[in-house]
Structures are given as C-alpha cells and as structure tokens.
Amino acid sequence: MMNVGQWLTRVRKESPLVHNMTNVVVTNFVANGLLAVGASPVMAYAKEEVADMVRLARALVLNIGTLNETDVEAMLIAGKAANEANIPVIFDPVGAGATAYRTETARRILREVNISILRGNASEIASIAGEQVRTKGVDAGDVQSDLVDVAKKAAHMFRCVVVITGKDDIVTDGERIVIVSNGDAMLTKVTGTGCLLSSVLGAFAGVGEDVMTSSVAALAYYGVAAEKAATQAKAPGSFQLSFLNALHETSAEEVDQYARIQGE
C-alpha cells in the first residue's frame, strides 16, 4: 500500500510539536512516549493560553479521559484555533457510551471542532455514531454491528478519518478501508497505551497532508514496537519500560518489514 516507514523517518527528522490536552492519568507516559518516538510534547490546558500554544504546534490531541467542564471549554477554544490555523486535530473520546455526560461531551466537541482523526475503541466509536452498545467502564464493549460499517458511518458523520483500535485496527475515511494487524495483547495491561497512540497519530499527522496514510503508518509503527517489546517483557511493569525503549529503537526499516496491512 505504502512505504509506512518513511513517515517515522519524517517524524524523527522534523520532531513535530504535539499539543496534548490529555487526561491526568496518562500525562507523564504520553509525554515520555512522544519523546521516545522522536516528537516534541507540550501539555497546556489553561483556556487563557491554549489558542496561542496550539498555533505553535503541528498537531492538537484532545482526550476526555478525566472529564470536567473547565477542560472541555479549553479544548473547544484550542480546537477552533487549530481549525483556523489548519492544524490537524485528533480526538480520543475516552469512555464515550459509559455515561450520558461523557457521550454528549464527545458529540459536542465533534459538532464544534473539525476533527481530522477520531480514534477510539469499538464501543466508544459506536456510541458516538448512534449504535446501541453498553460499555463497561472505558473498555470496549460488545458491538453487534459490523465494525467496518460503524467506522465508515462515523467517518461520514464527522467528515474525518476514523480509527477503531482493537486486535485488528480499522482505518477509514469513509471510502477507503485499511486493516492494520500489528500489536500485542500486553498493550491492554498498561494504562495510557491507547492515549499515547492518539498522540502518536498526532505526531504522524503533523508531518504530512494525508491523515489516512499517516494514521496507517502510525498504527503499524506502534504495533511493531509493541511486538518488539513483548519479546523482551512478559509482565506489565517491565513491558511499559520495554515499550518506551522499543518506540525509540524501532527503525523505519523494521516497520516496513513487519507491518501487517490489508486494504487500499
């Protein structure tokens, strides 16, 4: 489909500044993860400065994991400023479907900000797209609808690239469909790996124009690094350390060699 490794090379060469408005559980892990990738993280939340900060960045990542109205107000300000500056916005609707407030907040952000990439698990994306699914906490529930159809529906609804992550990752712009099958189950045993992935999607989107292709490349790289880390660590604590190292050490050539990608 593409030379996905070249995107990693570009990220490491350009070290894009990624403005993260993420949750308090994962802030340190996300910042260190982006540094390991080769990007530059900034975490800024105050509504008084987010518009100025986002104009310095190459991507904006919005994550509602620890949700409150103050942060939502700041996210909307930052998102609109990013739209004005043609900076890609990545939205991670953590826990959408778990509560009415969380689901409606996700939909509000999608109404008021033009999102470039919507990244979530199956139940989060299904809930936002109007599919009926019960969610246990913020983990993926059982989605009856075909996930590809759910992803395409969401892509058309919100006019963006949709990434549904799971054992196999689905990427679509509403027309093209790509499946990325890299990764390791140990990712589910360390909190923040999904949130970091959303920020890595931002780093890759920040160095090119085609967010569909950049998303596929980011997913392949992230999954290959996870597979590499899993060969060195068999428990969550050591895996977290090994994964950060693998993000730093994985080469563009390894991504091209081990990426498992199907689709256009």
From Swiss-Prot:
InterPro entries: Hyethyz_kinase, Ribokinase-like. ATP binds at R119, T165. Substrate binds at M43, G192. It catalyses: 5-(2-hydroxyethyl)-4-methylthiazole + ATP = 4-methyl-5-(2-phosphooxyethyl)-thiazole + ADP + H(+). Its EC number is 2.7.1.50. One of its GO terms (biological process) is thiamine diphosphate biosynthetic process. Pfam families: HK. GO terms for molecular function: ATP binding; hydroxyethylthiazole kinase activity; magnesium ion binding. CDD domains: THZ_kinase. Its cofactor is Mg(2+). SUPFAM superfamilies: Ribokinase-like. Keywords: ATP-binding, Kinase, Magnesium, Metal-binding, Nucleotide-binding, Thiamine biosynthesis, Transferase. Belongs to the Thz kinase family. This is Hydroxyethylthiazole kinase. It comes from Anoxybacillus flavithermus (strain DSM 21510 / WK1).
